[in-house]
Amino acid sequence: MAGLLLLVILGGGWLLWRLRKKTRVLSQKLREAETTFHPLEVDPDAPLTKLLTFLDELAAPKRRTWGVALLQLFGRTRLGDKVIGERAQELSAQLRGAANVYVPNLQQSMADASRATATTDVAAFLISMVQGSVTGQLGSETSLHNPDADLVEPFLSGPENWTAEEVLSAFQPSQGSLQIDLLGNLFVDPFKLESATGGRPLLNVALKAVVDLNLESLVNKGSMGHFMSFVAAMESTYTDVPYHNRVHAADVTARLCALLHRSGIRRHAEARKDRMAIFAALVAAVVHDAGHPGTNNGYHISKRTELAHSFNDQSVLENYSLNLAFTILRQHNFTQNWSTSEFLRFRKTVIAIVLATDFSHHFDHLSKFKAKVGSSQGDAVWDAIETQDHLLLLVMAMKVADLGHCAARLEVHVKWVSRLQEEFFLQGDKEREAYLPVSALMDRHKPGPASGVNQLGFFDVMVLPLLKEWCHAFPETSELLNQAEENRRYWEKDAKEDSDRRHSQGLGKKHSVEVDSLEP
C-alpha cells in the first residue's frame, strides 16, 4: 500500500513537472508570437475578379488550377460537381453581398488579419484611405493658392510664336541644359533634378516632355508661351510641404513619360492619330497635386473645411487641384486654337486621370484593369480591350507613376518615405490641436510610414498587386516591379530587426487603433 502511494505521489509530481514545463514553453511561444513580425495578409481580389478567375479556370483546361484539377481527377462526378457548386455558391454570395463588385472587402479582411499581427495601424490607415472619414467638427481651414506672378511673367513676355526648343534654350537652368532620358529611364532621380533645374523641376520636365513626346503640334504656334506660363503657374501653386510638392509632381510626370513610352501606349496612340490622349495625360501629371496643403481628404472631411464643403466631400483635394488647373488655364489658355470637341475631350481625360489618383477609387480601377486586360501582354492588350477602355490604360499608367516612389531606387525611395512620414506627422499634430482623433500612422509618438512593418502592409496591399498587374500587361516596364520587390525586402529586414529588438526587450505587440471602430 505504501509503495502504491509512493508511486502515485511520484507520478503526480512528474505530471506536475511536465505541466509546468509545457506552461513555460507555451508562455515563451506566446511572448515570441506577440513580438515576432507577421506580414499583413489580406485578400486584395474583388468579387468580380474572383468570379472571372473561376470562370477562366473552368474554361481553360491548360491552366491546371484547383477547379480544373478536380474536374480532370473526378470527371463530371458528384464530388467534382459538389466542389464546383460550393465554390460557385460562395462567389455568388460574395457578389450579392458586395457594396461594389470591383472592390475587395478590405474592412473584414484587414480586421481579421490585424488581430493576428502587429500591423493594426497600417490596416487602419489602408481602410481609412479607401473608405474615408466623415466625422468631426466644423472648421474654416482652407488652402487657396494663386500663381506666383514673378515666376510666370517671363513666359508671357517672350516671342509670340516660339517653339518648345526655343523655350528650352531661353529658359534652361543656369547649370546647363536638362540632360535626362524621359522616355527610356524609369528611375530619374527627382532630387538631382530639382538641383539641376534651379528649383524648377516641374517646368523643365514638362517642357522636355512636350519635345520628347512629339506633342508640339498640339500646342500651336502662338500658344507655346501660354502653355509654359500655364505650367509655371501650376508649379507655383505647389506648396513647400514635405511630400506633395513640386518635386513630387516632377517625379510623377517624368515617370509617366517613361511608362507611356516603354509600355507602347504612346506608340499605339500615335498610330491612331490620338496624340491628344498623351498630351492630356502629361497635363494631368503636371496638375494632379496642385495646391496640396499637406493634409489628406479625410482630414478636410473630418474638420469640415471649406474645401470639403466646396466639393461635397468627394475626392476633395483631387477636385481642388483640377479646379485650380482649369481656372489658371483661363488665364494662360494654350487651347485657344482648338476646336470645342478637342478641348472637351482633353478636359474629360485630364479630369478622369486626376480623379483616379484618389485612393478611395484604387481597387475599382485595378479590378477593372484586371477584368479588361486578363492575361494579355504587350501589343495583345490592345486587342483585348475596347476603344472606350483606352482611357483606363492612361489611368493605370498615372496610378503606377503616382505610386512610383515605392519602385524608385532604394536611396530615393527611403528619402520619399521619410518626407511622407514628416507630412503625416504634421497632419497628426494639426488633428491633435483641433481635438480630432489622430489618424493612423500620423501620430509622431508612434511608428509611422517609415516603420518596416507599416511599409510592408502598404506594399503587400496596395503597391505590389498594382505593379504585378501592370508589369504583366506591359513587361517592358518590369524593372519597376523588380525594384519594388527589392525595396520590400529592405522593409522586411527592417521589420524583423525591429521585432528582434522588441523581443529582446520583452515588449509585446501594440494595437493602438481598433480596426473595428472604423466603420463609416
Spans of features found by a protein language model:
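Amphipathic, well-ordered alpha-helical segments in soluble domains
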Residues: H226, F230, D251, R255, ...
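Internal amphipathic alpha-helical repeat/solenoid segments
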Residues: N214-V241, H261
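Transmembrane-helix exit/juxtamembrane "anchor" motif
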Residues: L10-T36, V42
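Active-site flanking loop/helix segments enriched in acidic
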Residues: N185-E194, S229-A250, E306-F311
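Divalent metal-dependent phosphate-bond-processing catalytic cores, especially two-metal-ion Mg2+/Mn2+ enzymes
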Residues: H38-A46, K50-W66, Q72-I84, A93-Q108, ...
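Active-site-adjacent "gating/activation" loops or surface patches in catalytic cores
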Residues: V241-L260, A290
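N-terminal charged/capping segments associated with class I S-adenosyl-L-methionine
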Residues: A196, R200-N204, S217, K221, ...
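Single-pass type I membrane protein transmembrane segment
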Residues: M1-V8
